[in-house]
Amino acid sequence: MAAAALKRMRGPAQAKLLPGSAIQALVGLARPLVLALLLVSAALSSVVSRTDSPSPTVLNSHISTPNVNALTHENQTKPSISQISTTLPPTMSTEKSGGASVAPHPSPTPLSQEEADNNEDPSIEEEDLLMLNSSPSTAKDTLDNGDYGEPDYDWTTGPRDDDESDDTLEENRGYVEIEQSVKSFKMPSSNIEEEDSHFFFHLIIFAFCIAVVYITYHNKRKIFLLVQSRKWRDGLCSKTVEYHRLDQNVNEAMPSLKITNDYTF
């Protein structure tokens, strides 16, 4: 009886404990789900930031290229001015040798040139850059010839150049002819295709004739016997022979016999 009473008391207590345990289980499941969602959101934000980050670098690269070009052109213009300044003293020496009383002008120092370049307007610098971009080759040629005293390059073609050009033209023609011949082999004309089709048809007929001859040669005895049997039948069943019924024309068939009523045994 006591055991039964204890079981009855435990039943309601367990029923009360079941909702609390279910709530704890749900809370335990919700925590890892929340952590997983946080990790996924952090990963997505990092990926988006990585994909968005290269765009400003590309823009900076596009923006920085003109500045680099401008700096290179400025660096090219500065040595040209210094080189021009170095070529000025010989002209003054020639004037002195001629006897003319002209006061020598001092050559500008590099510091004064840099200050003058810095004081110049940006519009003038842009015009100089445009002029250098329009004709860089002529400026370089003049500077090179002035520095080293080399003669101008003769752009006229010589006989050797003409021979080389003729050789290259002949080689190109040879390559073109070879390519055309290869194309003609690869892509035959319609006439060749028609001839091929006729040849195939004639080949089939020739093979059929060879098969007939082979069969007749190996079966010539049978064919000969068949022909002879047909001739024998034609001889027996010829249209020239007339057949008569024996019961009507017995006298004609056997004239030695006579119809008599006397029979001998």
Swiss-Prot record:
Q: Enumerate the Cytoplasmic topological stretches.
A: 218-265
- Location in the cell: Membrane
Superkingdom field: Eukaryota
Return the Polar residues bias intervals: 72-96
Give residue spans on the Extracellular membrane side: 50-196
Q: Give Gene Ontology CC terms.
A: membrane
Kindly list every residue the record annotates as glycosylated. Answer: N75
Task: Indicate the secretion signal residues.
Answer: 1-49
Stretches for region Disordered: 72-123, 135-168
Primary subcellular site in the record, as a coarse category: membrane
**Annotated TM spans:** 197-217
- Keyword Nucleotidyltransferase on this protein? no
This protein's membrane topology, according to the annotation, is:
Single-pass type I membrane protein
Q: Which UniProt keywords apply?
A: Glycoprotein, Membrane, Phosphoprotein, Signal, Transmembrane, Transmembrane helix
UniProt feature, compositional bias: Acidic residues: 114-123
Q: Which residues carry this modification: Phosphoserine?
A: S229, S256
**InterPro entries assigned:** KCT2 (IPR037645)
Key word Chloroplast present in the record? no
UniProt name for this protein: Keratinocyte-associated transmembrane protein 2
Species of origin: Pongo abelii (Sumatran orangutan)
